[in-house]
From Swiss-Prot:
Top-level division of the source organism's lineage: Eukaryota
Gene designation per UniProt: Slc25a37
Lineage: Eukaryota, Metazoa, Chordata, Craniata, Vertebrata
Matching Pfam families: Mito_carr
Knockout-associated phenotype: Erythroblasts generated from murine embryonic stem cells null for Slc25a37/Mfrn show maturation arrest with severely impaired incorporation of iron into heme.
Official protein name in the record: Mitoferrin-1
InterPro entries (UniProt xref): Mitochondrial_sb/sol_carrier, Mt_carrier_dom_sf
Subcellular location: Mitochondrion inner membrane
Length: 338
């Protein structure tokens, strides 16, 4: 979202440019809203990148244990000891049988990828959104512009994030042969080559482009309903972000299952499907999932995915908007001083 002064039309009806306040109307505004309205209508690229990096790191750090469970639930042929019926039960069993810190294995590599990936993502999204809104709609927000901007930003995000996804998902699997991110990177590099880190890239894009399109279009629509003036409103960001993330997650679960299979290359599942060597390509992944589990296989882990994405997107939006607000306000204050 862009920093706005009370809505698409900048100066909203409740605020007069000449400072005239009738019936005590100006006094009813809280200081935070007034401060936000006085900020510039757009933030700098460095602000978008810093706020985006913080949002990505905090989002993935907080939700990482649930992400670990989701990865295991999407396994096509899990070990009998790694069959779970609920997220809580899975986390409890993993910590009891594999160690308290086991659900966090791979968090370090995820944080290293999430920071720069989200920094580029939000910076690209904000600038593309502003440019495309001028092209598609001169009166305000265009849902088409938001969807296209999110899709374009996804290309940059996934280029950085895909190698981190490959490593962290292999570390998350039950009985993983890798004990650390470094050993996983070294083994994959030596045995499968550089291409292994991008084997699921096309599937990742095929999943994330519709995911982000649904996410941003839904988010902007909900913002119009719960926050029509587009003020800085953390509660509206949390609600809109959470619901948009849940809907997008449910709709794209089949693609996420295929991505997980391409990333993890489950040996037992591939042998049951008579796949020799390494599985590659989205079409092959779709065919293998159906061969092993039928239509139900495409929705393995949907509960964990929705439960993961709903708070994740809520955290991401609220943290991003908070840091963007703080950083832009500080830049404005420094500019005023000098």
């Amino acid at each position: 979202m862009e920093l706005r002064r009370g809505g698409v039309g900048n100066q909203a009806a409740g605020r007069r440019m000449d400072g005239d306040c009738r019936d005590g109307g100006c006094g009813s505004k809280d200081a935070g809203s007034e401060d936000y309205e006085n900020l510039p209508t757009s933030a700098s690229v460095s602000t978008h990148m810093t706020a985006g990096a913080m949002a990505g790191i905090l989002e993935h750090s907080i939700m990482y244990p649930v992400d670990s469970v989701k990865t295991r639930m999407q396994s096509l042929n899990p070990d009998p000891k790694a069959r779970y019926t609920s997220i809580y039960g899975a986390l409890k069993r993993i910590m009891h049988t594999e160690g308290f810190w086991r659900p966090l294995r791979g968090l370090n590599v995820m944080m290293m990828g999430a920071g720069p990936a989200h920094a580029m993502y939000f910076a690209c999204y904000e600038n593309m959104k502003r440019t495309l809104n001028d092209v598609f709609s001169h009166q305000g927000n265009s849902h088409l512009a938001n969807g296209v901007a999110g899709s374009m930003a996804t290309l940059l995000h996934d280029a950085v994030m895909n190698p981190a996804e490959v490593v962290k998902q292999r570390l998350q699997m039950y009985n993983s042969q890798h004990q650390s991110a470094f050993s996983c990177i070294r083994t994959v590099w030596r045995t499968e080559g550089l291409g292994a880190f991008y084997r699921s890239y096309t599937t990742q894009l095929t999943m994330n482009i519709p995911f982000q399109s649904i996410h941003f279009i839904t988010y902007e629509f909900l913002q119009e309903q719960v926050n029509p003036r587009r003020d800085y409103n953390p509660q509206s960001h949390i609600i809109s972000g959470g619901l948009a993330g849940a809907l997008a997650a449910a709709a794209t679960t089949p693609l996420d299952v295929c991505k997980t299979l391409l990333n993890t290359q489950e040996n037992m599942a591939l042998s049951l499907a008579n796949v020799s060597g390494r599985l590659s390509g989205m079409a092959n992944a779709f065919r293998t999932v159906y061969q092993l589990n039928g239509l139900a296989g495409y929705f393995k882990g949907i509960q964990a995915r929705v439960i993961y994405q709903m708070p994740s997107t809520a955290i991401s939006w609220s943290v991003y908007e908070f840091f963007k607000y703080i950083l832009t306000k500080r830049q404005l204050e420094n500019r005023t001083l000098y």
